[in-house]
């Protein structure tokens, strides 16, 4: 993306308004967002009363009628897990160009499988409580925030306005790119110094783009402060960085598990000499993580559940 395109996106997000010819969509106030949330709630309840299926209900109905495979839920979970594992593999092999190319192919294929799995559902999702309520919520917001020639604009058919609004939404990959670019980083660095990141009025809520840009700016800021901060090449690669996130999360969870074991068994010294660790029933310990420690040569040799003795 050219620098001028980066700046246009950033300044458009900062302005908060969506402008298309003589139509303008302004940021919603917090009161308007509250009212729209109430529209969603009432619409959802009304749909339930009218016998319309929820999103989960639609999935179950489609499975029962052979419109989705019986393995739908298992396949969905397995494919999402595979995507996470592939991203971790991508990070772990970041120095091997040939491996990275092959892994990216695996990731693309797995995402395609997940998309294909949901394809039949996407054709019917407009018949759910969630979709109907979300549409009515959006129409409510756009009715309150859309202007034509500086006058409130509430057309009988909102499809054109909805399309304009949807086209203004930045994808996650674009938001992440903008959060990393120098133009935005120089603006972000001035936050908190009596400097406005966005043009919004005091009672305006953040737009979706503004909220997402703040979220990712904070994420990248935290990454830079991390003791295990990855290289710029990793940070600039969304999938590879996701792999780093997942690995860091697993590391933190493993450390937490080990700390819980130490508390249950006494001091660290006693832990290092123990051949057996007794885990009380109901303790929040993931045995598989501890077994990983055993395989890597750490001092945890065996995990034995002894509920009666622990009580």
Show the residue positions of the predicted features.
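Charged, long alpha-helical segments
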Residues: 119-157
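Generic alpha-helix detector with strongest preference for long hydrophobic helices that associate
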Residues: 33, 109, 115-127, 155, ...
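Charged interaction scaffolds used for protein-protein
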Residues: 1-19, 33, 148-311
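Poly-acidic low-complexity segments
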Residues: 73, 78-79, 96, 142-143, ...
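N-terminal leader/presequence-like segments
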Residues: 1-71
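Helix N-terminus capping/helix-initiation residues
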Residues: 29, 69, 96, 124-128, ...
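Low-complexity, serine/threonine/proline-enriched polar segments
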Residues: 46-120
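Charged/polar, solvent-exposed surface patches and flexible loops
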Residues: 8, 35-42, 81, 112, ...
